[in-house]
């Protein structure tokens, strides 16, 4: 069975209750299914806390974090360090054998600079599946942070939705984007069960989909097109539904190519 990538986002990394629910769902799923799982994560809340503690400004452009050269080390420490190891600690607590990685390990995802105006922000492209496939074949849960590296050795902060998309293309995997919201909401706050590119463009034009959700929807649309299969956006809050979601039952918004 093809692997499943679960991209973690929102305040999940900041909530012990959310992490407990997630890892309990992962344990339950792994006990009854053979499907290999991969976690990809960002950690914006971890970065924001660190930046605030250091009195550094947080600047975003089109939903993407501007990352100056003097901040990439801090952001790498927060994402590939604190956020990644926090997830590994929760996996250990739940007796799941896991391995912490960043996008550059084994050239799993290739990264180039996205835009000079954004600084050390990377564009992710599919890379080599060898390392992660080897880990999956041996029963490990790879936990991959959204820090990448260019061919000339520059560390890059990559939007985690886009990183997960590139890794899904690398592995031929299905993709779920887990966030704080139960999916994409319409103008009345109701969940939209299915979303096409034309519907997304309409809601963006109407100002209903804004900011970071635009990045998330576009990443999901890109993923659906690249993978040739639907991509799910859903919430981690409904833990009892997560095993069904991991098995292909939509509980949030299903993005169609």
Swiss-Prot record:
Residues reported to bind substrate: 43-44, 65, 157
List of residues binding ATP: 180-185, 208-210
Segments crossing the lipid bilayer: none
Keyword Kinase: yes
Listed GO CC annotations: cytoplasm
InterPro entries attached to this UniProt entry: AceGlu_kinase-like_sf (IPR036393), AcgluKinase_fam (IPR004662), ArgB (IPR037528), Asp/Glu/Uridylate_kinase (IPR001048), NAGK-NC (IPR041731)
Entry GO MF terms: acetylglutamate kinase activity; ATP binding
Reactions catalysed according to its record: N-acetyl-L-glutamate + ATP = N-acetyl-L-glutamyl 5-phosphate + ADP
Compartments where located: Cytoplasm
Pathway membership, UniProt: Amino-acid biosynthesis; L-arginine biosynthesis; N(2)-acetyl-L-ornithine from L-glutamate: step 2/4
Entry EC number(s): 2.7.2.8
UniProt enzyme class: transferase
Biological processes per GO annotation: arginine biosynthetic process via ornithine; L-arginine biosynthetic process
Alphabetical list of Gene3D superfamilies matching this protein: Acetylglutamate kinase-like
Keywords for the protein's UniProt record, in alphabetical order: Amino-acid biosynthesis, Arginine biosynthesis, ATP-binding, Cytoplasm, Kinase, Nucleotide-binding, Transferase
Site (Transition state stabilizer): 7, 216
Role, per record: Catalyzes the ATP-dependent phosphorylation of N-acetyl-L-glutamate.
Family statement: Belongs to the acetylglutamate kinase family. ArgB subfamily.
Subunit structure: Homodimer.
PANTHER family for the chain: N-ACETYLGLUTAMATE SYNTHASE, N-ACETYLGLUTAMATE SYNTHASE, MITOCHONDRIAL
Protein name: Acetylglutamate kinase
Gene assigned in the entry: argB
């Amino acid at each position: 069975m093809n692997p499943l990538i679960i991209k973690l986002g929102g305040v999940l990394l900041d909530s012990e209750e959310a992490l407990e629910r997630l890892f309990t769902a992962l344990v339950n799923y792994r006990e009854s299914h053979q499907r290999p799982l991969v976690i990809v994560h960002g950690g914006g809340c971890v970065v924001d806390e660190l930046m605030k503690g250091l009195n550094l400004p947080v600047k975003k452009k089109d939903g993407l974090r501007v990352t100056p050269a003097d901040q990439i080390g801090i952001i790498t420490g927060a994402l590939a360090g604190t956020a990644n190891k926090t997830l590994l600690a929760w996996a250990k607590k739940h007796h799941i054998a896991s391995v912490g990685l960043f996008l550059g390990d084994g050239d799993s995802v290739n990264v180039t600079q996205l835009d000079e105006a954004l600084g050390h922000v990377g564009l992710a492209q599919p890379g080599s599946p060898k390392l992660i496939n080897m880990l999956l074949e041996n029963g490990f849960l790879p936990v991959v942070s959204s820090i990448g590296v260019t061919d000339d050795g520059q560390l890059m902060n990559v939007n985690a939705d886009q990183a997960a998309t590139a890794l899904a293309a690398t592995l031929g995997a299905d993709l779920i984007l887990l966030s704080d919201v139960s999916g994409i909401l319409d103008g009345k706050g109701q969940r939209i069960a299915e979303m096409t590119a034309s519907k997304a463009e309409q809601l963006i034009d109407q100002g209903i989909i804004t900011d970071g959700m635009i990045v998330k929807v576009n990443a999901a649309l890109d993923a659906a097109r690249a993978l040739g299969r639907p991509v799910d956006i859903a919430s981690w809050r409904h833990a009892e539904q997560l095993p069904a979601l991991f098995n292909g039952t939509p509980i949030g918004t299903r993005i169609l190519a």
